[in-house]
UniProtKB/Swiss-Prot annotation:
GO terms for biological process: cytoplasmic translation. Gene3D superfamilies: 2.30.30.30, Nucleic acid-binding proteins (2.40.50.140), Ribosomal protein L2, domain 3 (4.10.950.10). PANTHER family: LARGE RIBOSOMAL SUBUNIT PROTEIN UL2M, RIBOSOMAL PROTEIN L2. This is Large ribosomal subunit protein uL2.
Length: 280
């Protein structure tokens, strides 16, 4: 996969950088694995906005992704690498030996024709899924389970990878993409390799309209609002925010303010927080 730059024929092309989609091998998705996807526009069941700056965008169909990888010891052939509008990673269509078809998150380097498997003692090979207890230290992994059997919940975004640092007792030490070092049950499963579309972080949309196509509405600064609408609003000209620290629209501290609950039960699994030099 690479990136595509454009000649500045129009203002919208001047800063546009897009993926070249060279890894995509099939344009039409597998019909049996599609489901309707209703847009919420950032509203909840009462119709109240719960997520600002969302709405519109191109209509999408949801692709059912196999995050559990629970079809053990049955080889699957990679039939295609496809685009998924609902995530940043590419997805791979697997044809299992028994005839079943499933989508998985495509790891970097997976190609059409490759054979992948999941199970307790499968080979350490890109795309294979197995428990942490059977994966060597130092291996890059993705689609990582938080709890055994629940399915992969972590490390699913484009270009991300976690790394197994070591094992002790019934726990594995894993460094997550954020830098956090955390304990995981050795029976938690993960997929070998790094998530595909590693150049996603270098994409530049080039114009506001392209954000609208993705369902993102303009993100208005608080300082550009009236005082009635935001704590940062009001004042003459470009006024300072007028508070000791930045605040959310609802008056809560933000930008660096710690929001994690004190004495959260899962604290005992976190060995080192992201960007924290000292170990607990």
């Amino acid at each position: 996969m690479g990136l595509k730059k454009f000649k500045p024929i129009t203002p919208g092309l001047r800063h546009l950088i897009l993926p070249d989609f060279s890894e995509i091998t099939k344009e039409e998705p597998e019909k049996s694995l599609l489901r309707p996807l209703k847009k919420s526009g950032g509203r909840n069941n009462f119709g109240h906005v719960t997520t600002r700056f969302r709405g519109g965008g191109h209509k999408r169909l949801y692709r059912i992704i196999d995050f559990r990888r629970d079809k053990d010891n049955i080889p699957a052939k990679v039939a295609s690498i496809e685009y998924d509008p609902n995530r940043t990673a590419r997805i791979a269509l697997l044809h299992y030996a028994d005839g079943e078809k499933r989508y998985i998150i495509a790891p970097e380097g997976l190609k059409v024709g490759d054979i992948v498997m999941s199970g307790e003692n499968v080979d350490i090979k890109v795309g294979n899924n197995l428990p942490l207890k059977n994966i060597p230290d130092g291996t890059l992994i993705h689609n990582l389970e938080l709890y055994p059997g629940r399915g992969g919940q972590l490390v699913r975004a484009a270009g991300t990878a976690a790394q197994i640092l070591g094992k002790e007792g019934k726990w594995a030490y894993v460094r997550l993409p954020s830098g956090e070092i955390r304990l995981f049950d050795l029976n938690c499963r993960a997929t070998i390799g790094q998530v595909s579309n590693v150049d996603h972080q270098n994409v530049s949309l080039g114009k506001a309209g392209r954000s609208r196509w993705l369902g993102r509405r303009p993100h208005v600064r608080g300082s550009a609002m009236n005082a009635v609408d935001h704590p940062h609003g009001g004042g003459e000209g470009k006024a300072p925010i007028g508070h000791p620290s930045p605040l959310t629209p609802w008056g809560k501290p933000t930008l660096g303010y710690k929001t994690r609950k004190k004495r959260k039960p899962s604290d005992r699994f976190i060995i080192q927080r992201a960007n924290d030099k000292k170990e607990k």
